[in-house]
């Protein structure tokens, strides 16, 4: 993969999935159990491992899950008791939607190299839309062939819904139709 391609794929979800998948062993978690990391096939098991309330997508526009739900430690927060939960749909070569959520009172990654594209409301909470576009020979910010990140925070929980090669309206709908597990 070329350096240009690596720089272009700057989604926090890519880093979270790659690192988590490489180091996470399958884990089992029961309600009330200590926080754990791993890959999970159900939202209920992932929520038990994460130790905080999760939200799951209700609409993925036909994009298939690219793996399991990944729960890992939030390294940026500096505490082993904070978790980040990641899931992706589609492929990063064609179209994709992804969701990360953490309980670290902020993002668990550095994804701010982009252009601010506006402010929206997700479940009544102000969210900032960012795009990897409009500078350094990147596509125009009006193109759908760009990476978009929609970020918002509710209390100590931080959310990032992201997309590649999807219309803004789809990313906004993806985020606004999240439902509590």
Which residues does each predicted region cover?
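Positively charged, low-complexity intrinsically disordered regions
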Residues: 6-9, 65, 180
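Secretory targeting and sorting signals
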Residues: 1-31
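Surface-exposed amphipathic alpha-helical segments
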Residues: 155-181
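Primarily hydrophobic membrane-targeting regions of prokaryotic envelope proteins
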Residues: 5, 24, 149-151, 162, ...
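Long alpha-helical scaffolds
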Residues: 27-29, 127-128, 175-181
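Serine/proline-rich low-complexity intrinsically disordered segments, especially terminal tails, linkers
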Residues: 4, 22, 88, 98, ...
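Short, solvent-exposed recognition patches
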Residues: 32-155
